[in-house]
Amino acid sequence: MANPKRKWSKARTGKRRSQWKLTVPNLVECPHCHSLKLLHRVCKECGHYTVRHKGERKSIEVLSVE
């Protein structure tokens, strides 16, 4: 089993662990119900999600098999 050659100092350990910080989630206001929600996600309160389409959508024909 591998063992370290030298002891890591407390300062070196602290410098390594300083990168373990958490980030605050980026919340925006829902345009439909004005509650806070995550970006690019469905609103948990009202279920609203704005999708912008560029250009016209092509219709898809669904064939039913009888």
From Swiss-Prot:
UniProt-listed GO biological process terms: translation
Question: Which keywords accompany this UniProt record?
Answer: Ribonucleoprotein, Ribosomal protein
| GO terms of molecular function | structural constituent of ribosome
Any Pfam family hit: Ribosomal_L32p
Q: Name one GO cellular component term.
A: large ribosomal subunit
Q: Which residues form the signal peptide?
A: none
Q: Which domain of life is it from?
A: Bacteria
Q: Which PANTHER family match?
A: 50S RIBOSOMAL PROTEIN L32, LARGE RIBOSOMAL SUBUNIT PROTEIN BL32
Q: Which family does it belong to?
A: Belongs to the bacterial ribosomal protein bL32 family.
Please report the name of this protein according to its UniProt entry: Large ribosomal subunit protein bL32
